[in-house]
Amino acid sequence: MEENNQNQCIPYNCLSNPEEVLLDGERISTGNSSIDISLSLVQFLVSNFVPGGGFLVGLIDFVWGIVGPSQWDAFLVQIEQLINERIAEFARNAAIANLEGLGNNFNIYVEAFKEWEEDPNNPATRTRVIDRFRILDGLLERDIPSFRISGFEVPLLSVYAQAANLHLAILRDSVIFGERWGLTTINVNENYNRLIRHIDEYADHCANTYNRGLNNLPKSTYQDWITYNRLRRDLTLTVLDIAAFFPNYDNRRYPIQPVGQLTREVYTDPLINFNPQLQSVAQLPTFNVMESSAIRNPHLFDILNNLTIFTDWFSVGRNFYWGGHRVISSLIGGGNITSPIYGREANQEPPRSFTFNGPVFRTLSNPTLRLLQQPWPAPPFNLRGVEGVEFSTPTNSFTYRGRGTVDSLTELPPEDNSVPPREGYSHRLCHATFVQRSGTPFLTTGVVFSWTHRSATLTNTIDPERINQIPLVKGFRVWGGTSVITGPGFTGGDILRRNTFGDFVSLQVNINSPITQRYRLRFRYASSRDARVIVLTGAASTGVGGQVSVNMPLQKTMEIGENLTSRTFRYTDFSNPFSFRANPDIIGISEQPLFGAGSISSGELYIDKIEIILADATFEAESDLERAQKAVNALFTSSNQIGLKTDVTDYHIDQVSNLVDCLSDEFCLDEKRELSEKVKHAKRLSDERNLLQDPNFRGINRQPDRGWRGSTDITIQGGDDVFKENYVTLPGTVDECYPTYLYQKIDESKLKAYTRYELRGYIEDSQDLEIYLIRYNAKHEIVNVPGTGSLWPLSAQSPIGKCGEPNRCAPHLEWNPDLDCSCRDGEKCAHHSHHFTLDIDVGCTDLNEDLGLWVIFKIKTQDNHARLGNLEFLEEKPLLGEALARVKRAEKKWRDKREKLQLETNIVYKEAKESVDALFVNSQYDRLQVNTNIAMIHAADKRVHRIREAYLPELSVIPGVNAAIFEELEGRIFTAYSLYDARNVIKNGDFNNGLLCWNVKGHVDVEEQNNHRSVLVIPEWEAEVSQEVRVCPGRGYILRVTAYKEGYGEGCVTIHEIEDNTDELKFSNCVEEEVYPNNTVTCNNYTGTQEEYEGTYTSRNQGYDEAYGNNPSVPADYASVYEEKSYTDGRRENPCESNRGYGDYTPLPAGYVTKDLEYFPETDKVWIEIGETEGTFIVDSVELLLMEE
């Protein structure tokens, strides 16, 4: 068969890289005008961000002075044609008209501004520039929303970015020059607040709309990917790149020129010859293949050094094409990185290796489609490949096989068209990827070039005249736990994320000044956890080691799982000055727990960039003075320092005082004295509004009815590196019922009716610190604050002054007013916040009732603790509306409950007093009634404990409304126990001290039951327990035993003397009558027999039935878990209150029986013996009571 080597080459079609496209049948010429304008604007923002007339003229020259209605229309068409969606005519016309109007008014404003610059003291020029600013500002506030009309946000996005940039520029003017124009300080500050708010608002809209536009596109075929990538690229150039510079308009953060960099990558169209109108996408890679093969994963910023291309060929017609390649790049400060082979390492020709000694700013490529005739009957073979590329650098060109016609400058035009492209280029080549697909009968291969903006410098050089912004992706090493992730859209590139504490990244910097110079730095970051960042300089080339130069807190800015937005990103303050160790130097950055090793590490830290500025003595003094002035002025409600702001805490004032104290006497002595007087005035105002007595902890328990009351283990300590004044330490406690506590009552006379009050303070560290505010009910919070450990850098011990005091001017972790915790209306206080607040509402006040308000701090476990100070209790605001109605309702409910409590108390007190009085012979309460037994005392005690509100349930040392009557009766109960114990001659008869005082034969146990009672257990018949007891011959005694018999046999308690006179009590687990020797009686007729003793002794279980809830009809089935019917004061909020006195006596379970007998000894010694015949005998108590004469 004869081979036909003829083939047809189809040239690259314009529709693969269109300069004009068809939309709805209409031919619209677009070119790249919107991209040209945007690139020129970005170049201007990179190099000329200094405010003033020059900046405004630049905006006119690059945008607003050259763009008319047709150009604005081209901005809209640029996106419309990609998303195949037209803006509604009304919206289009309104947007173009508004843009034209804004441009006209901006030109007038610039004229007025330039006139004022030339004659700044002329009232006429000042008035005119204010008028023109206000007109333009109002138009922008009105018109910018028209550039985000619902449904058309994506095609309007590029003009939205231009208008937003203009608005931020003039707002910055008003903040910088406003007071010189004649605006008030209040007006300037209001404009600054709007500037900050709009920076976030505009940046977030740009990023969110960008993502929404991409998400709305189809994602199936190769052509879908082409559209997707073009939209991604064009919106990056015309929107996101501009939005990345929005934060630089914050002139208070950037008082001098910042040096911004764009590290993001954009991708030009694949070098694949394809005509979507004539050819099928079946021979091309799918959307997913393109996205996974052509687009690189997020990575550190790298620089292209070498490209080696491997040439392949197709046998039919011997057609050579780009078959694969390898890229060698480098990281700034790091070594070379060799990529894996893209495509195939073919060897049909020797590999072409190109080492570029400069940036590749342009490629001219030749992608081809060859229709190759194969031997019959095979169909023609479609071969798509790249047959040649020319790479251009500013000084040279490098050619692979041949030069093509597909020019990268048509997609990424120069940023400056006034000079040749080798000087005015906007992007440089940074990488190349490869895509392919094969089948029958076709083979498709293509190269995709990625590009980075030229603003991303090839070194991290510190310019001493500017604020140097260095994206952290320009480091050379990230450590385990750190990853590079796709940026949120408004950062100008990818960012770093770390999900655990540890080393973050290492980067190399070059210093363009003497090595002895000192610098400051700060971070732009977002974090869902509190952390501390440590910067080491002089690290090894691996990024390990070095000396700590910066140690500063990064406070939480977002919640876990929250999306990254411009609002979630914050800046730290500039650090204390530090020096580099070498030139170039290695910076190591790590993240550590903010509060020490025990801190919770859940959450993530994201860092966008580090910013470095030169610092000198004058700069430091001016910076410190500016910061101190700002902090002092922020304390007051107005410039005349009449009143403090409500949110200014006492701790805050102390920290501001430290700032003032640390100002340089050499550079700003007069200013320091003035600020010191102001901050002292602020401290006095703070003391005046604080309703707490002795807020500085001069003493505890100094006065019975005033100031702080607390447990004896609390310590007061002097100021340290955290507190300027005294603070208290609350240690743990070994018994929950005896907590460590600190409390104070706010007198009723200090409170205003229907007002909200706030308790707040500063906690250095705490574990389960309980905080209460109590009036009608309790507001309660449990606060955990891991300790800071130390505020000083890790490289040095806490410095001290010449007299041993903390040196608060030494470099340390700086105070951050944003570290706050607010607990309002029952909300849970966030953990790990040093500042706490707790609110409570007060209804009507009554000086006669003197209810007042209790402030309580409590620690109730051994391992817990707290250190706190700067406590304040102050009036917050009058109650209105719903809050007023709520407190009135709470007050009414409280009064209703108080009335019910009073009625209940009258009844309960009467019953309790009668029970207590019945124990004694007379009203002197010095002798017990003859028939008073332990059960009767328990029963009386039970009734006393039914008196509610004897003590506050939150802290039982604070008396409640019924404290006086409770303590009166409880004291008599205590007396009854003492008299009863004096009358019982058996020692340790309740076995609470084990077998102390008892003689033991055989195996016996003392067990603590579930009701916390100790019982004697005799499990074997040969065992015996006995005790010798001294008695008075001729006197009568009562032997009383409470016991339980388990199983067969009998349990016996015998009393006898040496020779005779023996008596015993027997216990069995049966219902048959038992015959007792001598004067004993059966279980069933014992009560009747007792009547013979003229009522002196009543039922054997008198008192016990009530105190223990005993029921003789319950079967004697021994239960290991007692069926408690415990008694308390009926409130149950405080389980420890019943421990006061003997109120914790617990009842016996069912099955226990109490028996007694009379005994008249003839000698001075008797023996009590306990034993059993079979089974198990359990004895609760043995008593031998002397009868009254």
Swiss-Prot record:
Keywords: Sporulation, Toxin, Virulence. It comes from the Bacteria. Disulfide bonds: none annotated. Gene3D superfamilies: Galactose-binding domain-like, Pesticidal crystal protein, central domain, Pesticidal crystal protein, N-terminal domain. InterPro entries: Cry1Ac-like_dom-VII, Cry_V, Galactose-bd-like_sf, Pest_crys, Pest_crys_Cry1Aa_dom-IV, Pest_crys_dom-III, Pest_crys_dom_I, Pest_crys_N_sf. One of its GO terms (biological process) is symbiont-mediated killing of host cell. GO terms for molecular function: signaling receptor binding; toxin activity. Belongs to the delta endotoxin family. Promotes colloidosmotic lysis by binding to the midgut epithelial cells of many lepidopteran larvae including Spodoptera species. Toxic segment of the protein is located in the N-terminus. This is Pesticidal crystal protein Cry1Ca. It comes from Bacillus thuringiensis subsp. aizawai. The gene is cry1Ca.
